[in-house]
Amino acid sequence: MKYSIEVGKIVEGALKHDYAKVINYTKQLIEKLEEDDETRAANKFSKLLTAQSETTLSAMGMEKVNPVPVDTESRTALADVIYPNENKYEVILSKNNEEKLKSFILSYQNADKLNSLGIGVSNTLLLYGPPGCGKTKCAYLIARELGLPLVVARLDSLISSYLGTTAKNIRTLFEFAQKMPCVLFLDEFDAIAKARDDSNELGELKRVVNSLLQNVDSMSSDSLLLAATNHENLLDSAVWRRFDYRLEVELPDNEAIVEMIDLFTTNTIELSQKEKKELSTVFKGLSGASIEEIIKKAMRNAIIGGSDFSKKSIYDEFFVHKNILPQNYQSDKELMSIKAKYLRNCNEKIFSFQVIADVLGSSKTTISKLVKEEID
């Protein structure tokens, strides 16, 4: 049955007198009806909502109907809610990971069809890999593509020093996320999902993992749970099994790096494909976050220093980021020699003496001599 998720949630909310759930899922149903050109039905449901009392109408903003729960001790919110119109993150992934992410999104978008065939929906995704590679941005992308709010757990509030409070907070957060159409995102997941056989951990953490597993198991099939970790080796084996999709978000490949260079230099400088290829060679092995940081710092320094932002600015900031330049150097020639040799060692075919000269603002003859150590 089409719209079975929304109808089921509305009925469930009505039976439990959960008006937040009724309103939020009715709004989602209206949006889907409008997308399918079911204008008459959409208008009918819209009129039902707008005919409610002033109190209910004021609650139609999700944050009023369904306030974000707080930790009972600190009174701080257990999560931040990011709405689709506030979600501006862009993420660039390898083509393989892009396809896997699309598959996960399509699974949810076709939930009605899958449920009608008795197949069920894959609604849990674990993102893992090195820091700065886009795991968090993937969560934002999924929520935006689905047009759903992203509920981002706040670990500083979720984890409590009081016995039993962390497990209680986890349960409260899961209950909150099931009251509305949303994507629940648990970042730095290993903090609450560590292996229970770790002898260095206290019994409290083991109770937390047990609570987490119970809450994941009790999630309805139409809810979405995303989790991310930089330390997948620390996760409890039972936690791994709870995730239908597991996506390793790796360091960007050359193609992804070139796309990042395009994105981060938009409306600033024009780089040729050859120049982008050269930059992607030196950026190899860096995370997307590091590449963004290098380019934005170079841009910032150029603006503050009153100079033009150029590819040389990017290379200069790259050398600083890699920390290959000595703090105490004898001459500018020494610095240029270090930079020239570094680029040459990256790839001799790409970084010819002429290319290095263009990058460093020198001559081909000088660079040749520096690389061959013919200048004292």
Residue ranges and their predicted role:
Residues 29, 139, 173, 189, ...:
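Aromatic/hydrophobic pocket-lining residues that form π-stacking "cages" and hydrophobic walls in ligand
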Residues 1-9, 14, 18-24, 31-35, ...:
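C-terminal alpha-helical "lid" subdomain
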Residues 96-100, 106-271:
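Walker A/P-loop NTP-binding motif of AAA+ ATPase domains
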